[in-house]
């Protein structure tokens, strides 16, 4: 999973982009280890469930936006098979470098340095677009969704896996305490990067809940939207489609 005291809502788009870029440039080599620790390894089971719901077809073409160190990219490559193709895109060169080390031996993966707000692809070319714990880092959530909508083929699927907001009182209180006190401490102890990982606390609190995100996806044009919260609602999967052409 992906500041300091200044809230990002006070930053313009360029300032937020630069801040987030610096965060991931600095934590790239420690990102995977700390993710396992701060999520208690739950992020793997969330993604496993999500992949089952996607039921990816062999031979498909997929785009993993904000691919980070490449874990979901690799799973998508396995799912589409040798006749499929998966592109992982990220704006952090250092995160891509880690991903490259994991994917050098995988023939159907291509990694690209690029901007999720201006995807370097033509319209209507991907069967699937995915974004895992990256949407909240974009300066404009709706613009990011619009770009993924644009590059999807009609009938194509988008899947968003992201932090969310627990609704049960026990989980809600625990969530606030964990992100405010425990998670930044993990960052300091295990990654020597409390400053960078405090961004996770902030971006998670500011990101819409699962119901609001579903509405935002509908406003973008996606249909047949379904979502599911995980682990008391601390994260959520959203799955939707670009309408088929009439």
Swiss-Prot record:
Pfam hit, one: Ubie_methyltran
Entry EC no(s): 2.1.1.163
Disulfide bridge positions per record: none
InterPro entries with a match to the protein in the record: SAM-dependent_MTases_sf (IPR029063), UbiE/COQ5_MeTrFase (IPR004033), UbiE/COQ5_MeTrFase_CS (IPR023576)
Gene3D superfamilies in the record: Vaccinia Virus protein VP39
Catalytic reactions of this protein: a 2-demethylmenaquinol + S-adenosyl-L-methionine = a menaquinol + S-adenosyl-L-homocysteine + H(+)
Keywords: Menaquinone biosynthesis, Methyltransferase, S-adenosyl-L-methionine, Transferase
Gene Ontology biological process terms, A to Z: menaquinone biosynthetic process; methylation
Pathway annotation from the record: Quinol/quinone metabolism; menaquinone biosynthesis; menaquinol from 1,4-dihydroxy-2-naphthoate: step 2/2
Amino-acid positions noted as binding S-adenosyl-L-methionine in the UniProt annotation, renumbered to this chain: 69, 90, 115-116
GO MF annotations, alphabetized: demethylmenaquinone methyltransferase activity
TM stretches of this protein: none
Family: Belongs to the class I-like SAM-binding methyltransferase superfamily. MenG/UbiE family.
PANTHER family listed in its UniProt record: 2-METHOXY-6-POLYPRENYL-1,4-BENZOQUINOL METHYLASE, MITOCHONDRIAL, METHYLTRANSFERASE
Its biological purpose: Methyltransferase required for the conversion of demethylmenaquinol (DMKH2) to menaquinol (MKH2).
Protein name: Demethylmenaquinone methyltransferase
Organism name: Micrococcus luteus
Lineage: Bacteria, Bacillati, Actinomycetota, Actinomycetes, Micrococcales
Gene designation: menG
């Amino acid at each position: 999973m992906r500041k300091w005291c200044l809230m990002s809502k006070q930053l313009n788009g360029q300032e937020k982009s630069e801040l987030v870029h610096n965060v991931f440039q600095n934590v790239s080599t420690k990102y995977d280890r700390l993710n396992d620790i701060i999520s208690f390894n739950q992020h793997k089971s969330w993604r496993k469930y999500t992949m089952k719901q996607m039921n990816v077809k062999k031979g498909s073409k997929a785009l993993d936006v904000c691919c980070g160190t490449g874990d979901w990219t690799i799973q998508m490559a396995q799912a589409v098979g040798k006749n499929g193709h998966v592109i992982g895109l990220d704006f952090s060169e250092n995160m891509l470098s880690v991903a490259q080390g994991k994917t050098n031996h995988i023939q159907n993966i291509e990694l690209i340095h690029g901007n999720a707000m201006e995807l370097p692809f033509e319209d209507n070319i991907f069967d699937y677009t995915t974004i895992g714990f990256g949407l909240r880092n974009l300066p404009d959530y709706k613009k990011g969704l619009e770009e993924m909508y644009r590059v999807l083929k009609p009938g194509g699927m988008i899947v968003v896996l992201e932090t969310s907001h627990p609704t049960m009182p026990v989980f809600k209180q625990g969530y606030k305490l964990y992100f405010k006190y425990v998670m930044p401490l993990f960052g300091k102890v295990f990654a020597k990067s409390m400053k960078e990982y405090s961004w996770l606390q902030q971006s998670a609190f500011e990101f819409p809940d699962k119901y609001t995100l579903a509405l935002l996806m509908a406003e973008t044009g996606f249909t047949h939207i379904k979502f599911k919260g995980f682990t008391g609602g601390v994260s959520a999967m959203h799955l939707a489609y670009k309408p088929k052409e009439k």
